[in-house]
Amino acid sequence: MAPISDNWPDVEASLEIMEPDFADRIISMVDQLQPHHPRIEAFASSFHPQRLPCRLLANHYTWGQSFLVFELLFSDNTSWIIRFGMRPMDAYFNTAAQLERKILNEVAALHLVRQRTTIPVPTIIAYHAHPSPSNPLGPNFPAFMLMTAITGMTIEDCGVAIHDMDSQSGVVFDTDPLGGDESKRPILQRYLRDIADIHVQLSRITFDRIGSFVIDDQGKVTVGPGADFGLGPFDSAKEFGRRGRGRA
C-alpha cells in the first residue's frame, strides 16, 4: 500500500505561494524536529500492538493553521499520523493556551463520536496538549497528537462528479454527475444516504452548555471554554450571542 502522504499537496509548491512569515513558521518547525525523528519513531512503535518499527516520512508533510502533520509508516505498511502544534502566529492566534484547548476539544470530540455513533473516526493513540517537562517526547517538544489513519476513496474516485451538485440542496446544475452511466447511481445514492446518516448521528450528541469539549484522564467529556478564545462555557444561546461575541 502506498503511503497516505503520497496524496498530500506538494510541499515545495505549497510553501512557494505562502507569505514568507507563514512559510518560515513551518520550515523552522520541520528543522527543529528533524534531529528527533528517531525518538518520535521509537515513541510511536512503543504503542504498536506488535511493537513494530516505523519511520517518519520526513520529505512529505503537510500542515494547517495550528499543526504540522507527518505520516508514520510501520513495517507492516499501516500508517499513523502525528501532529505537532506550531508556534503562535501572533499574540492572539495559536497561543499555547489556545492550542491546548483545541487539542483537548478534538480528542474529546473523537472520543464522543466513537463512543456514541457508528461513524468511523481515527483512534487517538497518545497526546500531550501543552509543552511541559512531562511531555513524553521530551521537555522541549511541542504539543502533539498521535493517532491512527483512515484511508478511503472520494466520491470522485468512484466516477461521480459530486462537485457539480449544489452543496446546499443537492440539486444537479448543468451536468450529469453520473456522466450518463446509470450503473453509478447506487454509488451516488449510498453516498448521499451515508452523509445523511452521519448528520443524523452527530445531531444526537447534545449537551446543555455551549463551548468546546474537554476530556479528563478517565475519559469523561464535559463542555468547557471555547477553543478559540477561551470564552464560556455558556448556559444559553442568548448568553453565547451576547458574551461569546465580545458584547457587553
Predicted regions and their residues:
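Juxta-kinase regulatory segment immediately upstream of eukaryotic protein kinase catalytic domains
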Residues: 2-59
